[in-house]
Amino acid sequence: MVFRNNSNVTQEDHGPRYDWDEEEKNDILGYFFWGYVITQIPGGRLSEKLGAKIVVGTGLLSASILTLLTPVAAHMGYLWLVVARFCLGVSLGIHWPSTPPIATKWIAPADTATFMSHMTASSLGVAVTLPVCGYLIAYWGWASVFYVTGSIALTWSLCWFYLIYDSPEEHPRISTTEKEKLRLEIKPVNTSLKKPPIPWMKMLTSGPVWSVIMGNTCAGCTFFVAFNQLPTYMSHVLHFNIKANGLFSSLPYLGKKCSLC
């Protein structure tokens, strides 16, 4: 989304300009999602095996570095930027599937709905970031967006490694009382029990399962088309300046957050 805003800038004082056609711009945006898809299933399994702390933390750290290096990749050429975007998608694709393994050890069943609503409403971050990025581009150039957001993400990734642990038992800084409270509220999963076979045929021939798949697919496609193309529409069709573009492009994400509160 950050790059989408940057690619709409046409004024010279906003930073270097690159002679990419529309197909190349869409490739730069699209390859992020190819990388994002690849790590969805492996991300969850890696978190179960290695722990979400190291898996998510590594993804955050690598994504931060890639964000900081994005202006350099753009200067080096189109293919370098495509590779950087693809790797960024790989790094960030592990986050959502890595959440359940750690959440089941920290979040009590009574708080699960609240926790998931906040996770789903993470679009608040987009709603805040878009207007800020618009002003950053207007005053300091498009590269400043990557340096500022990359630096914030880098700081957060270091905080993640320091603050987050895979289970209450591993955390050295919470009290015994809190550990006992979590132990009583969260029932541990008995991994020694024999797992029943997965009913693949029943799942693949189930109408409700396919309804959920199709619903999520259509919603996801619609969301990400708007996610990528809304700033372009604001710029090329409505002719908003970069500050107004960021502000108005953020409104759908603010509405999404409000609807989930």
PLM regions and their residue ranges:
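Glycine-rich segments within core transmembrane alpha-helices of 12-TM secondary carriers
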Residues: 111-139, 144-153, 252-260
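Cytoplasmic helix-loop-helix junction between adjacent transmembrane helices
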Residues: 82-123
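Central mid-sequence intracellular linker of multi-pass
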Residues: 109-114, 137-205
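Conserved MFS/SLC helix-loop-helix module at the cytosolic interface between two early adjacent transmembrane helices
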Residues: 38-79
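Extracytoplasmic gate region of multi-pass secondary transporters
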Residues: 204-260
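Central cavity-lining transmembrane alpha-helices of secondary-active solute carriers
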Residues: 27-45, 250-261
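Short hydrophobic/alpha-helical segments at membrane-entry points of transmembrane helices
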Residues: 77-85, 211-212
